[in-house]
């Protein structure tokens, strides 16, 4: 019976190839206003074309060439494979057209594939070599003028990126048999506002509708079991009802939506316990019987109540964390409108981006808080003060981009100021670190232009890469005796810095460490052994004194130092020199080493090598 059916289908397809006539969608009431409007949109500058295929891979040969850029409504029947979709994509990605009045107009196209059967290229079976009936991955992605589409009636799965980036797509009509929507299937369809998900659908893939900015309403069928990460990110959803059987809700599924409230079914588990930033959210509730979550006063907690997972971002004023909470979860208050938070003495940990981009104005943590996670308060533009008396460990970027932050205090037990911890804190005027700090890591205070004073702890051993780069108000630094290394560009562009004295323990001055410190006129290098490329480039030094301990000089250590008149190198053996600069300047070396310098690589290029006086 099956082979007979195929034979009848093939014969029927051979009888008619191309017809110019109206066509209609079958998945709904054809009298519905949505459908009537859809067909009334065709106009005199385009036509309706119906094509019936007998073999896959023949769409291009059957399409009248003169219609490729004119067709407004294209109805296709019969078997199609990837070759046909490639040509169809070309039709849907055509350029704008010129109307009868010589004006450029949108060259939209509506496509009907209701009676299409999708095959793999070269397959002899109607459903492809895998036996499935899917819209291929990337099938019509970035079809810039596709306005609406009716999908094949036997469709089971819509592939990843199938209609991704179709910026003019307004409407999708899918058949009742669809069970799965692939990752990014409709993402970036900025004008999509109408779509009906069929009963029987079980899976909505990652970022499936991400960026569908006009999608305000959607009904999720009761059959859906899984919703992927960021599935509805950036949509205009204001209300959604999750099915009772939903077991998996991906991380950030509703990020940047307009949801005001949300009810979680008892069976649902949230990926990474993160629903996303919902700026209008006022309340979240959890169905009784959940093994994963509980809620109180519209706030989401884990099932024990010890971790606060989500505070509605639409609430303002002071947030009160109840007794018994031990952890503020990642993103818990991120982007919220709160101005302050009242924490109990039970809280010990603040998670990743817990308060990032919130409206908080001051932070006074209880002594019980020992850990502040990565980016915990990043980009809190109104934050002016932070007191962290018990914090022993702080994640990178903890206060990055807090442009109003004027002061902070930390625990006397903290040992590391982490990467980018206070970068771009433009109102910070002074830094006083506890004696326990041994390391200031890369970019910790980069581009803090108002910092005029830094009190370094006595036990500090390392200043990392770009740690104070761009701190233009810094005029003087007193480096502690324990300091061993200064990283790349650590003080670059500190234009107010006038004097630097390296301690005896400091052996490494990395490349560009003081580059563009245009007021730096006096440098004492202590017992340094290595100076990196451009370490003192574009400074105001007049005499560069290299200690006896130096063994290596990078490229152009003192390049473009306009006030430099003399270099004194006290090393008996010529240090390795990667590339000379200022070779016309007088070079003074130990009297017994003059001949050695005159024959040493790169040193020999100096024009005037004289003994030290």
Regions found by a protein language model. Name each.
Residues 2-11:
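Bacterial N-terminal signal peptides that target proteins for export
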Residues 10-20:
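Bacterial N-terminal signal peptides
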Residues 46-54, 72-80, 100-134, 144-157, ...:
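Structural signature of tandem-repeat unit edges
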